[in-house]
Design a protein with these regions (language model features):
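Eukaryotic protein kinase
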Residues: 1-176
Length: 177
């Protein structure tokens, strides 16, 4: 870790374990719907996904009775804000946002005002400054507002692992160093 950020091998390990955890949740037929940094507890054995308070099983309605969307700005997928049902792909967008937060040390869509955070997420305007080129490109893809253009969690992890081979890239934010 560097300056509170997860970089290189540390980010790759965090990402791999978090992705494994979310895959297990999805294999059980559950969509978490609220993956954010405060719901990822880091233990000696890796991250633990917590707070399944708004999680839903397959076939359940994913919108509240009043039609309100549940989630945390900056960590809720853009399509959910537009009224789409939560699903595995929206959880994966949230995982990418959490990992980008871990890599940069701050929420990549900002913190306020809330509407501005939602607008930046909807536009795919993540602040990924300082990340190596390959990792940055993979995060841009994983956080794309158009879900059909997003890379898979495994592709994101592969880009992080590749950049982890060059520790200097995480210092300079440029894999060509």
């Amino acid at each position: 870790r560097a300056n509170g950020r997860y970089v290189g091998d540390d980010l790759e390990r965090l990402g791999r374990k978090l992705i494994e955890a979310v895959k297990a949740v999805h294999a059980a037929g559950i969509v978490h719907r609220d993956i954010k940094p405060t719901n990822v507890m880091v233990s000696n054995t890796g991250p633990v996904l917590v707070d399944f308070g708004i999680a839903m099983g397959e076939g359940e309605s994913h919108v509240t009775r009043t039609g309100l969307v549940m989630g945390t700005p900056g960590f809720i997928a853009p399509e959910i804000i537009d009224g789409a049902e939560s699903d595995e792909m929206s959880d994966w967008w949230s995982v990418a946002s959490v990992l980008a937060f871990a890599a940069t040390g701050e929420p990549v869509f900002g913190t306020k005002p809330m509407m501005a955070v939602l607008e930046r997420a909807a536009a795919g305007s993540a602040n990924l400054a300082g990340l190596p080129a390959g990792t940055m490109a993979a995060f841009r893809s994983a956080l794309d507002p158009d879900r059909t253009k997003r890379c898979t969690p495994d592709e994101l992890l592969q880009a992080i692992a590749l950049d982890a081979l060059n520790p200097q890239a995480w210092i300079s934010g440029n894999t060509s160093d």
